[in-house]
Amino acid sequence: PLTAPESRALYEFTRSVNPELVLAYHTQGEVIYWKYLNFDPPEGRRIAYQFAALSGYTVEETPYASGFAGYKDWFIQEENKPGYTIEVGLGENPLPISEFDEIYRRNLGILLLAARVHT
């Protein structure tokens, strides 16, 4: 799993900064996935709903079929700390650049709260 250079870099970066939570951004769905299989880290659900209140996105558990080998899944399992996949935007990928300002506006609160949790 850590054979790709980008995977190795993300792994090493995560180990070096020891975050209290991680965010993995994807583009499709306006949903926040917060759980990995039966791993339910402390505060994971509560923070997910705070993110949802800030962004207007919905909160869902990661679907079983897609809940393998992702960054947040690895982090939750290895660290027992909250991890989130945040799906931004709706429409056909790649999303048009014209969507950026709205996506940024809806996600700024998530980024600020995540930074506060980390410190």
Question: At which residue positions do the language-model features occur?
Answer:
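Metallocarboxypeptidase
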Residues: 1-119
